[in-house]
């Protein structure tokens, strides 16, 4: 089987193909020219005729035909080059005849080659037909496969040859495109040159017009000068005529006078000679004046010509400069366009990068939000686990105390209790009544929020950190002192109805209540530590949610929380004492609820607290009073309770240390103040009449509270036992609040006073926002607005410059309290757990 390309095998078709294709040939030289040159020539229809066959001679014949066409084109070029380079007419004719003979010989040889090729192709066809017949007769399947492979190889060879031809054509087309591009550039350059020449022609035409105008002006000047010369000549002639007339008149008179004389001729001769002398002199003078005037006019004309020539040269120079500047302007415009394109590209890239960065920022914010929610969830789970742990610890401690109470009851006589005064406290009936009240009333949440807005305006940042530390410490101490005084007043009012409602019980009931009070003390201690942990965990969550840069502080706070949780499990005795404290707080909550139930009709509209000095005296005096009260309470607790855990001592030390540190910081960082303006606005809204009464009354010392408690419970020992224990609980609660505030203040000082802080606090696993808390019906709002302005003027001695620093610190405190009550059944007694959380939000705004 044979696969022939009939379309390419036809010589006429191939001629048509070769006519449309131009071949590029490089000629080394010619007989008449000794240089290398390139030429573009098109092959004639009779130059190349080849066929694409399966025979082996086809590529060789095609190559020979291409060589012949290149030789013919080289001969054509040599002919043209000899014509261009020149020579004698005989040489040109001789070379032309030689070239014709060579072309005829080559054409004859090429025709012979073509005939031979046709003959060989015919023979190849016959031989291939015979071979194919033999193959069809004798070939097996394997032989057919070999034949097919051979055919495929041959077809691939032909395909490669066709691809080679195609590549050659593509190369030629590329060369043609390059030539076209080069010709286009040349055409553009020629057009540019034409424009330049046309511009030069227009400039020359303008010069010609200007020169013609100058010529006309000069002609006018020449005409005017000629008119002036004619006028002068006429004047001169008139003067000469006048002189001649005068001479003739004088001659006539002389003739009349000398009429009688005989010697007239001599006199006339003399007169004529004199007249001629005068006329000659006048003529010479007139000619000299004319020549002088003409010379002056010619000099003026030459000067004008020089000025015109210099002006023309300047004009030409200016035109050349204008052309150069126009060229520079075009180049600058090109650079401007390129720079604008680059700028647009850069802006597009910048916008793209900005959009991508915004997408990444949005993604990171979403991830951060997710991590915050995850963190809050983990914190809620942690709080739930802590609550479960605390409940289990309370149960364990209750069972332990029940067992210990049974042992002590069997060991000692029920009526004779001769221990220390404050080791075993007398029971009180108020527990049962309180529990009944908590059954009826709905649980109340009390959350305290503080909004601190600091607006700082200063022209120069100087000693900013120390000043802000002082102001923040003073504000925190004032708020702590005010909250402390309010709680003391509330506790004093609560102690009175508790003492009134305490009847006498049987010895067995007293023993049971002693055990319950011990459990309450243990629960109070545990609740205090849990509140400290909640404050620290809230602060850690606030720092992590608002500022990513404070991750190290969060880790430190988490380590503190872990340390506190480990410390909680150190000893069972400490847990028992904490349970007792929690039960004591349960009693306080129940007393408050009883008072609210008994006196609902006394609720009045909220009244503002009039005395400003009670809320904000000097910070140092407040701090000193708070420390003295804390020390007195600590001493009384040591007298009352013999078995005190080391944890409580550590808590008290922690409470005292931050205030001492704040006082030291105040002493170390003094600030020179020129003018200090303090504006304090306090507005408080209270819904219960009991709280209004506590606000109207001034804070009483702690000793009076103790005396009242002792007088009310004078006949019974439980009253005297109860008042110091309640004061102890109050002290712990207040100290816990102060400690949380001081720790928060230290964190804000470490983060820097100039930065904006907005902290959201998660309390007991609930993310409570201020907007949601304001919607609560039973929530009481306390607002303390403190505005402090500090103006500072410092002068530098060297430069004589004066710095004016103005600071305005506005602190807004909003206190909202919510109470959570939980009920548990334990051996026919009910325990109520009170969790008071303080959520503190600070908004700090600094303006320079």
Curated annotation (Swiss-Prot):
Residues 148-246 are annotated as: Coil 1B. Forms heterodimers with NEFL; which can further hetero-oligomerize (in vitro). Forms heterodimers with INA (in vitro). Residues 264-285 are annotated as: Coil 2A. Residues 2-102 are annotated as: Head. Residues 290-410 are annotated as: Coil 2B. Its main location: cytoplasm. Neurofilaments usually contain three intermediate filament proteins: NEFL, NEFM, and NEFH which are involved in the maintenance of neuronal caliber. May additionally cooperate with the neuronal intermediate filament proteins PRPH and INA to form neuronal filamentous networks. SMART domains: Filament. GO terms for cellular component: axon; myelin sheath; neurofilament; neuromuscular junction; neuron projection; postsynaptic density; postsynaptic intermediate filament cytoskeleton; presynaptic intermediate filament cytoskeleton. It is found in: Cytoplasm, Cytoskeleton; Cell projection, Axon. It comes from Mus musculus (Mouse). The modification N-acetylserine is found at residue 2. GO terms for molecular function: structural molecule activity. The modification Phosphoserine is found at residues 30, 97, 224, 344, 416, 428, 466, 482, 502, 506, 537, 545, 550-551, 605, 610, 645, 669, 689, 715, 723, 753, 769. Expressed in the sciatic nerve (at protein level). Residues 1-51, 482-785 are annotated as: Disordered. It holds the Pfam family Filament_head. The modification Phosphotyrosine is found at residue 318. Residues 1-10 have a biased composition (Polar residues). GO terms for biological process: axo-dendritic transport; intermediate filament bundle assembly; intermediate filament cytoskeleton organization; microtubule cytoskeleton organization; neurofilament cytoskeleton organization; regulation of axon diameter. The modification Phosphothreonine is found at residues 565, 642. Residues 286-289 are annotated as: Linker 2. This is Neurofilament medium polypeptide. InterPro entries: IF_conserved (IPR018039), IF_rod_dom (IPR039008), Intermed_filament_DNA-bd (IPR006821), Intermediate_filament (IPR050405), Keratin_I (IPR002957). Residues 499-509, 534-553, 577-604, 611-677, 689-711, 720-732, 748-760, 771-785 have a biased composition (Basic and acidic residues).
């Amino acid at each position: 089987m044979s696969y022939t390309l009939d379309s390419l095998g036809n010589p006429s078709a191939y001629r048509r193909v070769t006519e449309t294709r131009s071949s590029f040939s490089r000629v080394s030289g010619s007989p008449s020219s000794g240089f290398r040159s390139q030429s573009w020539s098109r092959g004639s229809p009779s130059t190349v005729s080849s066929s694409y066959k399966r025979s082996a001679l086809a590529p060789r014949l095609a190559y020979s035909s291409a060589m012949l066409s290149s030789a013919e084109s080289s001969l054509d070029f040599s002919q043209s080059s000899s014509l261009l380079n020149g020579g004698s007419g005989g040489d040109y004719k001789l070379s032309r005849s030689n070239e014709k003979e060579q072309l005829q010989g080559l054409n004859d040889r090429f025709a012979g080659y073509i005939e031979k090729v046709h003959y060989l192709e015919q023979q190849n066809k016959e031989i291939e037909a015979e071979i194919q017949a033999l193959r069809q007769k004798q070939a097996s399947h394997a032989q057919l496969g070999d034949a097919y492979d051979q055919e495929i190889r041959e077809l691939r060879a032909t395909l490669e040859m066709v691809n080679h031809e195609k590549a050659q054509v593509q190369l030629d087309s590329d060369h043609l495109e390059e030539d076209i591009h080069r010709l286009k550039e040349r055409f553009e350059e020629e057009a540019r040159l034409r424009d330049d020449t046309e511009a030069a022609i227009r400039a020359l035409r303008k010069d010609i017009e200007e020169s013609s105008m100058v010529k006309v002006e000069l002609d006018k000047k020449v005409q005017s000068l000629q008119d002036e010369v004619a006028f002068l000549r006429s004047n001169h002639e008139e003067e000469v005529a006048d002189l001649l007339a005068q001479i003739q008149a004088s001659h006539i008179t002389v003739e009349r006078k000398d009429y009688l004389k005989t010697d007239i001729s001599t006199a006339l001769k003399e007169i004529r000679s004199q007249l001629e002398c005068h006329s000659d002199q006048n003529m010479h003078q007139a000619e000299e004046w004319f020549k002088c005037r003409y010379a002056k006019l010619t000099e003026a004309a030459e000067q004008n010509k020089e000025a015109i020539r210099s002006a023309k040269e300047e004009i030409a120079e200016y035109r050349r400069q204008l052309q150069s500047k126009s060229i520079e302007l075009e180049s600058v415009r090109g650079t401007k366009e390129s720079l604008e394109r680059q700028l647009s590209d850069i802006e597009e890239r910048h916008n793209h990068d900005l959009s991508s960065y915004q997408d990444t920022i949005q993604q990171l914010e979403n991830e951060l939000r997710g991590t915050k929610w995850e963190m809050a969830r983990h914190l809620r789970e942690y709080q739930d686990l802590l609550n479960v742990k605390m409940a289990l610890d309370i149960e364990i401690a209750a069972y332990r105390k029940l067992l210990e109470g049974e042992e002590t009851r069997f060991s000692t006589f029920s009526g004779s209790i001769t221990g220390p005064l404050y080791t075993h406290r007398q029971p009180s009936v108020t527990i049962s009544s309180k529990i009944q009240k908590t059954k009826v009333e709905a649980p109340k949440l009390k959350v305290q929020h503080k909004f601190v807005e600091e607006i700082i305006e200063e022209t120069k940042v100087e000693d900013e950190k120390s000043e802000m530390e002082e102001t923040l410490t003073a504000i925190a101490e004032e708020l702590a002192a005010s909250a402390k005084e309010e709680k003391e007043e509330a506790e004093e009012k609560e102690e009175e109805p508790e003492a009134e409602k305490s009847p006498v019980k049987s010895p067995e009931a007293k023993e049971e209540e002693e055990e319950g009070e011990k459990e309450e003390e243990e629960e109070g201690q545990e609740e205090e530590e849990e509140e400290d942990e909640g404050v620290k965990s809230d602060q850690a969550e606030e720092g992590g949610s608002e500022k990513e840069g404070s991750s190290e502080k969060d880790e430190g706070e988490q380590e503190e929380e872990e340390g506190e949780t480990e410390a909680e499990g150190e000893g069972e005795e400490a847990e028992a004492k904490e349970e007792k404290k929690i039960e004591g707080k349960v009693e306080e909550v129940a007393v408050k609820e009883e008072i609210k139930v008994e006196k609902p009709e006394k609720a009045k509209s909220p009244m503002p607290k009039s005395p400003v000095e009670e809320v904000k005296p000097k910070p140092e005096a407040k701090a000193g009073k708070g420390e003295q009260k804390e020390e007195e309470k600590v001493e009384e607790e040591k007298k009352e309770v013999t078995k005190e855990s080391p944890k409580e001592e550590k808590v008290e030390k922690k409470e005292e240390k931050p205030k001492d540190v704040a006082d030291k910081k105040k002493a170390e960082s003094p600030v020179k103040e020129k003018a200090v303006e303090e504006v304090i606005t306090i507005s408080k809204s209270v819904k219960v009449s009991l709280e209004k009464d506590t606000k109207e009354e001034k804070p009483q010392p702690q000793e009076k509270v103790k005396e009242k408690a002792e007088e009310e419970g004078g006949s019974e020992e439980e009253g005297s036992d109860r008042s110091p224990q309640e004061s102890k609980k109050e002290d712990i609660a207040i100290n816990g609040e102060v400690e949380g505030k001081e720790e928060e203040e230290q964190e804000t000082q470490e983060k820097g006073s100039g930065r904006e802080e907005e902290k959201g606090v998660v309390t007991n696993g609930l993310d409570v926002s201020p907007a949601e808390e304001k919607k609560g019906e039973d929530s009481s709002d306390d607002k303390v607005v403190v505005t402090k302005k500090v103006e500072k003027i410092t002068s530098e001695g060297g430069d004589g410059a004066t710095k004016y620093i103005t600071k305005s610190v506005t602190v807004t405190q909003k206190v909202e309290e919510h109470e959570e009550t939980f009920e548990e059944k334990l051996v026919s007694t009910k325990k109520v757990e009170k969790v008071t959380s303080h959520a503190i939000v600070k908004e700090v705004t600094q303006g320079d």
